[in-house]
Regions:
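Small beta-barrel nucleic-acid-binding modules, primarily SNase/OB-fold domains
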Residues: 2, 6-7, 16-170
Length: 170
């Protein structure tokens, strides 16, 4: 029994994925995959939801995605799970945003956005996710597609990364 527990703990500690979490209050929804929170001593942080890419606000379903996130998160206390860096429980990404999973009452909000057909699983950064999480996100996207939920109700929804690329050139 002790050996099994020890092995599980060691497996976790030696895992290539090291995550920490911190509690924060959601104060603003930027779009379907970005929020502002107050953390610690009222420090404002911008959070980019890990593993998803929601439609941009000017895209089809961009407003719906943002509205849904606002409905379920605005004003709520959440846990943010992110990779720790130095003395902080988070790492900043390229645009100086915390990249993390948002958890509300034990539920994975990033995953919920995919299940509701309001975001893609952002596979470009899948290496930043544990394997079981990747599988859950892939499965959720497949099921939403099959059921024509949200953005999947359109014939050929344009992924936000392609939309951004097309609109940068203009």
């Amino acid at each position: 029994m002790y050996l099994k527990s020890f092995l599980i703990v060691m497996l976790f500690l030696l895992s290539p994925y090291s995550f920490a979490d911190f509690n924060a209050k959601v104060v603003k929804i930027i779009d379907g995959d970005t929020i502002d929170v107050l953390y610690g001593n009222n420090q404002k942080l911008r959070i980019r939801l890990l593993g998803i890419d929601a439609p941009e606000l000017k895209q089809h379903f961009g407003y719906e995605s943002s509205f849904y996130l606002n409905k379920i998160l605005n004003g709520k206390s959440v846990a943010i799970i992110s990779s720790p860096d130095k003395n902080k429980p988070y790492t900043l990404g390229y645009y100086k945003r915390v990249i993390g999973k948002v958890v509300l009452n034990g539920g994975d909000i990033n995953l919920e956005m995919i299940k509701e057909g309001l975001a893609w699983h952002f596979k470009k950064y899948k290496k930043n996710q544990p394997i079981d999480e990747r599988r859950s996100y892939n499965k959720a996207e497949s099921e939403a597609r099959k059921k024509y939920i949200g953005l999947w109700s359109e014939d050929n929804p344009l992924p936000p990364w392609k939309w951004r690329q097309q609109n940068r050139k203009r």
